[in-house]
């Protein structure tokens, strides 16, 4: 089979799929982030989408991908509990980069969820996972389906957490190709890119936040903390979008 045959890859077990993509990933590791985006647009199937949480370093991947695909749909899963600074940052970047923003939300409003389940994020790992399934995973699955996505760009980096340390440039997740063009970047490379292109960090960066999600499960970084400890009370790093 062709290693870029999405249907055939989806029929394989996870380990076999990774093996089938190993040679391609070895080639992609040697490319720049810009070249990885170009390669994906030329070799992977459309429709293409880009997801963003509009977090601390979100401007990097948003700028990187839209420089080559200006009209790519940008998927935001909005929980309704983002920081006010995040919503303003979304507006700012959407205008600055002329983003084709697609906002997806849970079918139940935040108030309805609290009435039905209570504050899920205060109910341990199981509650957090249920909250994430409702507010992140289901809306993302719906977005991928409605936008007919076959290739998904995301801005994950290996040095963000242990759960991301071994991710490849190219994989298959939720039935679509997933490409991570800045997977091997460090904080210095991110800073240099932002400076070069006149882009900003999320406003809360200057207040001591290394990672930003919902108001109720995000903490400022303090000396001695790992970055993943600033999210979900240190119980989880991933919100569910990038698992599986």
From Swiss-Prot:
Principal location listed in the UniProt entry: cytoplasm
Keyword Cytoplasm applies: yes
Top-tier EC class: oxidoreductase
Gene Ontology annotations of biological process type: hydrogen sulfide biosynthetic process; sulfate assimilation, phosphoadenylyl sulfate reduction by phosphoadenylyl-sulfate reductase (thioredoxin)
SUPFAM superfamilies referenced in this protein's UniProt entry, alphabetically: Adenine nucleotide alpha hydrolases-like
Gene3D superfamilies, per database record: HUPs
Catalytic site: 239
Catalytic activity annotation: [thioredoxin]-disulfide + sulfite + adenosine 3',5'-bisphosphate + 2 H(+) = [thioredoxin]-dithiol + 3'-phosphoadenylyl sulfate
GO terms of molecular function: phosphoadenylyl-sulfate reductase (thioredoxin) activity
Family: Belongs to the PAPS reductase family. CysH subfamily.
Protein name: Phosphoadenosine 5'-phosphosulfate reductase
Species of the source: Cronobacter sakazakii (strain ATCC BAA-894)
Gene: cysH
